[in-house]
Amino acid sequence: GPSGFYGVR
């Protein structure tokens, strides 16, 4: 997700 580790995948 947007605030996940990868941002937006």
From Swiss-Prot:
Keywords: Amidation, Neuropeptide, Secreted. The modification Arginine amide is found at residue 9. It comes from Locusta migratoria. Coiled coil: none annotated. This is Locustatachykinin-1. GO terms for biological process: neuropeptide signaling pathway. It is found in: Secreted. One of its GO terms (cellular component) is extracellular region. Myoactive peptide. Stimulates the contraction of the oviduct and foregut. It comes from the Eukaryota. The keyword Plastid does not apply.
